[in-house]
Amino acid sequence: MTYNKETLKEAIVQKLRLNYGCTEKQATDGEMMKACAMVLRDIMAERGVQTRENTTREEKRKVHYLSLEFLMGRSLMKNAFNLELLGALNEAIDELGFKAADIFEMEPDAGLGNGGLGRLAACYLDSMTTLEIPAAGYSICYELGIFKQKIVEGQQVELPDDWMQLGDAWLLPKLQEAEEVHFGGTVRTRWDNGHLMVVHEDYTRVLAVPCDMEIAGYDTDHVNTLRLWQARSPKPIDMKLFSQGQYLHAAEERAMADAISQVLYPEDNHYEGKSLRLKQQYFFVSATIQSIVRKHIQQYGTVKNFHEKNVIQINDTHPTLVIPELMRILVDDAGMDWDAAWHIVTHCVAYTNHTVMAEALEVWPQQLFETLLPRVWQILQEIARRWQQQVDDFYHDPAKTAKLAIIWDGGVRMANLCIAGSMAVNGVSALHSEILRKDLFKDACQMQPDKFKNVTNGIDHRRWVSQINPGLDSLIRDLTGGDGYLTHPMELKKLEQYVGDTSVLARLDDIKKANKQAFADFAKKQQGVVLNTDAIFDVQVKRLHEYKRQLLNVLQIIYLYQRLQDDPDLSIPPQTFLFGAKAAPGYAVAKRIIHLINSLADQVNSDPLCRDRLQVVFLENYRVSLAEMLMPASEVSQQISTAGKEASGTGNMKFMINGALTVGTLDGANVEMHELLGDENMFLFGLKADEVEHLRHTYDPQLLYQRDPVLRRAVDTLKTGFRDGVTYEDIWQRLLTDTDGPADQYMVLADFAAYCDAESRMRHTYEDRNRWNAMSLTNIARSGVFAADRAIAQYADTIWHVPYKK
């Protein structure tokens, strides 16, 4: 069926009548949003059936992308855009008596992720579908998301994010495809005719019910699926306890099961939290791999060719338990011998590493495995024993055996399990992959050098330019001769020929001004804040973590504020600093830094001296839909992590493709951006990764503090506090003393002077509007390499070995 404005109107009206028992005149905005979603869902579902039939008939190899996060954002506009129905849907909504903008605004962000890891997974799903790779994403259907951030008296407060109230319109429950996951119990083994028979008994059963979200690609009828698992108890209530009046106890089993799929990243600084997180991870991978194996056997009647027809890509260490779980299924359920099963596992599982931070390389207490996952624990012990033997045979060095051990000192090291059980291990930027090869995983890399690869991250440029920045999209189409860049992003290179064209640069400037005004209107409506649109929009939005160094930005703003106090006639362009970040609920220091940003904002914004000159704003509840408004309006992109700590970053790419200029360190993908742009098109500063490592052994922040009066004055403001009466001596101590770990672990003070200089260079350049806009256009023109389509093609060529649409 061909869809246009009229057929969409008919379909929407029918959905309203059949699902909500109302006409278009009676429907609420929420009902209208859900009806529109259901219409698009039906179109995608139909195409999805056809896609899966083609994949089955042609016996294509499938890619299964496992990630604990998928930060999807809103889907109504995205799906309409990919289905090339956005214009028709806008008109249909308007003609039914609604405002299309209001309907799109009704949709909540899907609460399935937190940061860059989840947004990357969402971008990759879009690209896999656009490139017509048979693929599926898998995750948990978090009913309350990560959390909704509220700022109360300057501090973060976490509220439940009940996104499914409206967001469930995209989900298709598949009760008939539910899987059963087992926790606890005991394991007995016996030999029978040379075969090891395993009996797992007295376990707790949890049902994993799949809810499928269809994923449409651009310029294709190919549709892939994101399968989200909901945890349910097979026994909704204990009737015996209920009839005795023990109502809470009667529903206890149900509540324990429900908890598994309620919240992303439950706090784990206590035993119960660790237990719940491990349950989440096992629940997710067990349901996923059972489902994949079941479908494979239905098609082929054997598991012997499983690795030839399936790739299991694990996004960070969270899904690592898929390795022992697939072994369990192959050995226990399919009756394979160990070596044959291990051959299959190590020829279909691939691991993407996303961090070099020690605390993020998951290590689980052995005791949890013994209690919660007794059979998986047995398999893990055997994997660990054989891997240890392999390391021993290669190195004959007890120190290296200890370093590479999977089980060591009462802990289970997930990254080492990934290395042992995967066919490929990749980093996500050239610098990051080099650190993996030469430092973090150096010993494993020497054993198996061909296993280690690099695939630099990429972004869904169709969403992050064409969909969210129509003014820039229109300019690109005019200058490159059409919409070819949407499927061939390297066509953006054609923009370079206009870098000296003042009329083009003036148009680019006008587009940025319009986007700044649109964001200012949004910020006023959402948060009641009035932004100065004549100021530089200087933006740092990302997860709040000390290594991302929001604190460095704060100190630089304090320094700038102090300069204005010393010299009220100081001639600098007006600057608006925009922050957006969520801190993990248990990360006390990160939450204090959010409080600090808000204390500084209160001080600066209430000072008459700063009016129309300096402004600081913390944007509440940073999320994809907020980023979609902010990125097109941003002029300066702060990418200032300690060199060697950020694996890649993708925010840097989104800013770049929208024409913001980067103030940054040579870290993550900034390195590759610098190779493309040179010093002349970004504002680099600070220590390099090797210099950070070299300095670490002798670094003394106290020395810098004593020698540099400008730095000392800025840092001491943390002790003296702000007009709200709040002081931050704890953060001061963290920078200058080693009472809680190494002083200034992320070298904020070491890079302070260089950072202030980079900001000064940026301000000076900003005043030359032609030069600034030429740099901006150059950034856009050279950003095509950071498209997710390029990254997925690289995965397909070098790791997955699957064909794709060229």
Model-derived regions, located:
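A conserved ligand/cofactor-binding region detector
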Residues: 1-806
